[in-house]
C-alpha cells in the first residue's frame, strides 16, 4: 500500500512538472532566434515603454532556451544597430517601427546569422 502511494505521488509530481514546462522548450533554435530578433528590435525602437520591458524579458527567455552560441545573439544586436530604418515611413511620413521589426526578424541577414550559428554547434 505504501508503494502504491509513493508511485502515485511520483506520477503526480512528474505530470505537474510537464504541465508547467515552458512552451519555449519545444521551439526550434530557428523559431527562438527569429523571435529574439523581433523582441530585440521592439526593445530598441520602443525604449522606455512597457512593451520594451516585456520584449527584454522575452529576449532573455528565447536566449535561455536556445542552444545557439551566445555570440550569435551579440552579432544580432550589432546587426540591428547597423540597420537603417529610414525607408520605413508611412504615406504621411511617420516612422513605422513595427513593420521594420517584423521585416528585420525575417530578413536574409538574420537568416545568415542563424545559419552561421547553427554551423558552429
Model-predicted regions and their roles:
Residues 7-9, 30:
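Hydrophobic alpha-helical context, especially transmembrane and signal-peptide helices
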Residues 22-62:
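N-terminal secretory signal peptides
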Residues 20-22, 82-83:
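Short Cys/His-rich Zn2+-coordinating modules
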Residues 48-51, 55-121:
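Compact alpha-helical subdomains of small soluble proteins
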